């Protein structure tokens, strides 16, 4: 969902509640439910809300299909392009953003779906696996010995 910042001027608040059916690099069997609001505060635009989705992934241990529920909250602070340029210019070289980090509302638009996508990526476990454990552990047991996997053995023999 693209939100134009002209919709949130003069103290108005924009509420949103929608289902994003597709999202880059994710298999979403049920889409992703996104609810929240956008408002203006002290010269910048705040977008905040929550999301919930089911992802279709593979277990990193047994490669079985799993469908974890991913849910969380998101927030972002945006500046129009002119104010964002001033903000960036005000930073000294090597200076960190500080407590308030702003994103640019490119072309005076805020892409809520892209903001949520970033939060989903951050909320994903690095190694999604079956819970509480894999049903078919035969592949896991096959390579769980202390020995080196024969497929990797030749890499150890490379001379640098």
Q: What does each model-identified segment do?
A:
Residues 1-58, 63:
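A positional/architectural concept
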Residues 69-72:
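Short Cys/His-rich "knuckle" micro-motifs
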Residues 1-6, 77-160:
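Charge-rich, low-complexity linker and terminal segments
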Residues 66:
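Cys/His-rich microdomains that often coordinate metals
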């Amino acid at each position: 969902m693209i939100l134009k910042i002209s919709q949130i001027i003069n103290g108005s608040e924009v509420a949103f509640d929608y289902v994003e059916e597709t999202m880059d690099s994710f298999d979403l069997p049920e889409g992703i439910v996104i609810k929240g609001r956008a408002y203006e505060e002290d010269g910048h635009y705040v977008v905040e809300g929550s999301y919930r989705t089911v992802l279709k992934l593979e277990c990193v241990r047994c490669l079985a299909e799993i469908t974890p529920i991913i849910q969380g909250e998101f927030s972002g602070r945006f500046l129009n392009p002119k104010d964002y340029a001033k903000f960036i210019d005000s930073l000294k070289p090597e200076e960190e953003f500080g407590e308030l980090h702003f994103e640019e509302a490119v072309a005076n638009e805020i892409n809520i779906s892209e903001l949520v996508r970033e939060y989903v990526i951050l909320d994903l476990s690095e190694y999604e696996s079956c819970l509480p454990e894999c049903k078919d552990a035969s592949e896991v047991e096959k390579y769980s010995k202390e020995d080196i996997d024969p497929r990797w053995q030749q890499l150890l023999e490379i001379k640098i």
